[in-house]
Amino acid sequence: MLTVDNLEKTYDSGDRALKGVSFEVSGNEIVAIIGPSGAGKSTLVRSINRLTEPTGGRISLDDTEVTGLEKSALRDVRRDMGMIFQEFNLVERLTVMENILSGRLGYLSTWNAFRRNFPPEDIRRAREILSRVNLEGVENNRADELSGGQRQRVGIARAVIQRPKILLADEPTSALDPDTSREVMSLLTDIAHEDDIPIIINIHEVDLAVDYADRIIGLSDGEIVFNGPPDDLDQAARDEIYRGGESIADREEPSAGNSTDADDVIAERGD
């Protein structure tokens, strides 16, 4: 179970991007985070694994409190949190298979990680996941040769090969066309149910949230103003979520696509 308790994010300027956010996620629940641009959605998702450092509150995954962990312990817990990025965060010069296997780098010794010497079980599982995300036949293609939908599937496969306890997806469909967006959401739904893990998805497209999520959390100006099933997201609830214009986080919230180099990808895998 993931527990977020009274989470706060205050920037150096004194502006508050998250204001006492609390919720729990468990089982194979798919939770969509919606809200206007700058409401704090990316800040929230990225605070869970401390890509963005919260300034108050508590985050725990099962029996491990994530907030306050030192560097080595944080690396360990990040292995249990698969991250899927808006801008894919692939290493462009590497092949599809190499990008997927990078999700296992944190489990290797320093020497084996440097040489990318993966055990046979990791390679077998990578091939299995290739089939699962419909990337058979392109495993030897470089990442920069792929379409947007294929690139996001590689990102999903890289997260899944970690065997995480939870998946965090930061706007996974924002760079995709409508049909491909639905394919990606369907794939994430299948993964949640088949692997029995929860997924938290920051998403702009309300219709996708309604169609694919089990629960929707609506953020407005850094606060939860809706938390319930899609069927309860009536027009009044939508008006409450989207009532404002530009918020603090529009000016301060970092883009989910800012960390794109190989070191950040490897760090995110837990190495």
Curated annotation (Swiss-Prot):
Region annotated Disordered, chain positions: 243-271
PROSITE patterns in the cross-refs: ABC_TRANSPORTER_1, ABC_TRANSPORTER_2, PHNC
Entry-linked SUPFAM superfamilies: P-loop containing nucleoside triphosphate hydrolases (SSF52540)
Enzyme Commission code(s) on record: 7.3.2.2
Cellular location(s): Cell membrane
Annotated ranges, domain ABC transporter: 2-246
Catalytic reaction list: phosphonate(out) + ATP + H2O = phosphonate(in) + ADP + phosphate + H(+)
Binding locations of ATP: G35, P36, S37, G38, A39, G40, K41, S42
Its membrane topology: Peripheral membrane protein
Chief localisation class: membrane
Record bears the keyword Flavoprotein: no
Enzyme class: translocase
Domain of life: Archaea
Family: Belongs to the ABC transporter superfamily. Phosphonates importer (TC 3.A.1.9.1) family.
Subunit structure, interactors included: The complex is composed of two ATP-binding proteins (PhnC), two transmembrane proteins (PhnE) and a solute-binding protein (PhnD).
Name the record gives this protein: Phosphonates import ATP-binding protein PhnC 2
